[in-house]
């Protein structure tokens, strides 16, 4: 697939801003040319994101493959995108979040994946009870699909296994659940036997993950759009995001969370409530007939 076709076929992915698929109304970015439509725009039609959590987070578990676990393509473990995310969360919460990284390199979603025989075990479906439910997180990130896509696992099997994990984790501890789309890569033929993937198959997997987010009311963090098809964000190995790519991925997940979890702003609002600036601006707004209203 050439670059022009790549961009044309991924336009819907690149337009996403990380909102869960359950939010179906148009976003601000989808409203088109503001000046052309301002005369007929109804503010009531503006999509408002669902608020999944009004309190700060206490414990994060991320379940994933090598990009989650990290490896020699990064000089330091804290360059992993999950670590980037944790630093962003800690920067806005009063108390740091407990961070449990359950990434395993060369991991598969389940024994049904064609990649399973040569993979590092146990697979996600063989370990989520212990690695996720056993820790009872209030924030859960499920980041799978890359290796199974590269092995050409049937989409129906992948979807069923993902659904089992999501359903069981929600039933057991009901965390805010984030699904990430499959990452961009460049070496689709370089690593036998998981060398059956392609951009086309990645797009199908990502549509599957979006549908799971919609069905199970999860937040979608669009890792694919974060990387945007930029080859320079991928390591020499052609598979893993490099340091800069991981910065983008971590920020994309944080963006999705911040847009859907008002609890991440709780500490800020408490700190600023009695500041001179807040007193001044809220007074001026009240005088103008436009008082501050907490809508969340």
What spans do the regions from the language model cover?
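Acidic/histidine-rich helix-loop elements
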Residues: 72-77, 102-123, 150, 193, ...
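Short Asp/Glu-rich motifs
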Residues: 15, 26, 111, 188-189, ...
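Active-site beta-alpha loop architecture of Rossmann-like, nucleotide-cofactor-dependent enzymes
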Residues: 13, 105, 147
């Amino acid at each position: 697939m050439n670059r022009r076709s790549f961009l044309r076929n991924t336009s819907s992915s690149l337009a996403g801003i990380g909102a869960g698929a359950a939010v179906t109304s148009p976003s601000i970015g989808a409203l088109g040319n503001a000046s052309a439509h301002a005369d007929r725009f109804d503010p009531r039609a503006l999509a408002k994101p669902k608020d999944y959590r009004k309190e700060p987070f206490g414990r994060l578990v991320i379940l994933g493959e090598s990009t989650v676990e990290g490896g020699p393509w990064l000089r330091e473990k804290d360059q992993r995108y999950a670590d980037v995310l944790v630093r962003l969360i800690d920067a806005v919460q009063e108390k740091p979040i407990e961070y449990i990284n359950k990434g395993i390199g060369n991991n598969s979603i389940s024994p049904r994946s064609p990649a399973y025989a040569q993979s590092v075990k146990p697979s996600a479906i063989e370990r989520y009870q212990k690695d996720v439910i056993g820790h009872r997180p209030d924030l859960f990130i499920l980041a799978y699909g890359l290796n199974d896509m590269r092995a050409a696992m049937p989409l129906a099997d992948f979807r069923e296994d993902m659904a089992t994990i999501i359903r069981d984790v929600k039933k057991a501890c009901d965390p805010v659940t984030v699904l990430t789309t499959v990452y961009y890569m460049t070496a689709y033929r370089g690593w036998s036997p998981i060398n059956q993937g392609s951009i086309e198959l990645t797009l199908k997997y990502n549509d599957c993950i979006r549908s799971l987010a919609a069905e199970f009311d999860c937040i979608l963090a669009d890792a694919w759009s974060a990387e945007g098809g930029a080859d320079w964000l991928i390591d020499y190995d052609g598979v893993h995001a490099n340091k800069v790519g991981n910065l983008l991925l971590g920020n994309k997940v944080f963006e999705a969370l911040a847009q859907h979890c008002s609890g991440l702003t709780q500490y800020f609002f408490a700190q600023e409530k009695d500041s001179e600036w807040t007193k001044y601006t809220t007074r001026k707004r009240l005088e103008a007939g436009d008082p501050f209203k907490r809508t969340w």
